Amino acid sequence: MKLTTHNTMSYQKPKQLWAKIIPFVARCQSVDYIKQYELGAVGFDLRLFWDKNGNLEFRHGIVSYPADNIWEVLDFIRDHDLYVRVLFELRSYNKKHVKNVETLKTKFKDFCKEIEDKYPTVKFYGGCATCDWEQLYVFKNDEHIPEIGLYSSNTSLFKSPNKILSVIDDLCPWIYAKLMNRKNMKKYKDSEQYISIDFIDIQ
């Protein structure tokens, strides 16, 4: 079993005031990226967007996190020979509220090229938009890692089509991690599979 972390940078304090009031919403990790590595992560998941002022930020859905440490994070990834999935975080439910989608897609593609040129040894993969999984950029080192996503929005706790239960499941990923992380890790313990999880500190 090889662990990667889902929404790696969501341990940070959100930028929006409303998200600071309810920080558990959309948070998928509670320890920083260095600790995630120390707990066994061999891959990270960086979801990118740009705010109204053109500043790069990490995102999970509509929740924004500061990305002023992006180069520090990428240096760490390079120095520890980690995989990193890079995604353009724009969901279908908020895409209609973003007027400059095509401009942002171009920014994402340009940024992917920039980091690939700056970090030629890093094993980047992804390059997609999360709203429809459109392939915006193809990384040269993309090894097409066959990750199994074992977190709430992929594998529901409730096993129900009920939309309210689905929202609870997606907004509170800690619940799934608390109930399922140990079971999932035990199941894949002797496997060579990559599994992507929330709250890697829950083992």
Task: Identify the residue ranges that each predicted region occupies.
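Long, acidic (Asp/Glu-rich), low-complexity accessory segments flanking structured domains
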Residues: 1-43, 52-79, 83, 93-95, ...
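Conserved, mostly hydrophobic/aromatic
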Residues: 47
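Glycogenin-like
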Residues: 66-126
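C-terminal intrinsically disordered extensions
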Residues: 113-145
